[in-house]
């Protein structure tokens, strides 16, 4: 069975709208595994982790995004992501 990203995104958005954040996290995790360069999904996933109090997981998602931006030459975006991380964990 092939992965339908559009359907998964729609399902995840529905879960967020319903306040079912843990279910949304699971959907976004599946999407992130299927497309590891989708920084929008990773950012949304990180934001959801923050919302449910899983700061460590959020930082992991945001670090992945920052590294992607660094490797692709988008240094200002990488710095912005690192600033987002520093707000979650000032140390």
Language model: regions and residue ranges:
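Repeat-based scaffolding regions
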Residues: 1-91
